[in-house]
């Protein structure tokens, strides 16, 4: 049954309330107290449920918590699945009160998986940057996705620069596409979460830039803040190149001109993170759901879509060393799912690595994973559509 909670507060007329914080908790079937952030849409377990509320004033001070208790009977009005998919709210957490083993579901049938001619230039190693230096550099042509994710592990502020450099003897033109930036921040999960949603909701830029031989252009000029020690920054960007364009990722001391990046020493890659250039780094995945039972679509596993794709986790080359490299998580790879279903079907996103935050586009609508915070167990999911 739907829960509707109203509240009144006493406050100065002139003073705004910048933040309102709801939490709710209950005791699960194993006797554990479970607490979730946000306002519950409904209750899906019998017993006592507690909802708390606190508000923040204009000076940043939080009120004492107000508390409201509900006693929920054993009378089931609707299952969680029935309720969530009838009252669709993309981004909300699917609690999985019954602790259904979602990983035990049968894999859905992938009719085919096709790759797209997109080159991925990925800079994620060394993830922890101790000193200024060249993090990655290679030349790209045609459609390219650029990705980096680095943490300042030194003692002084750094800037991470994403640089386009024409090292040919002819003018080179490239077009800016979608882009998403995040950081600096101390929270790596927050950085990935913000970067992904900013990229997905960004519009195609369309700006054309022509570089003369030897000329450079700062691709991430929107990231102006220096990165303080222990903070990190990331970016994901698409470009379309006519000709051959060098792209470099460099860590530089604050105040250094990015155009002097060629004087920097090359920083060695550090496992387990990777860096490299990868061909055919975009997938279109076609799924046919027959509607008979719940099924799973597995992304990010080495054997995902085996029989349809030789190597799902892409391999490439570290252009700075010539060594073969493996993108163990398909970081920066754009994957599009095309799903056909025989019946009306609900979609849940279930992270298998426990604590997770992220975002997807579902039918061109941004869906946050989740809208109210981290997913903390492999039993929970997020309602996508």
Question: Where do the PLM segments sit?
Answer:
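C-terminal edge beta-strand
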Residues: 62-74
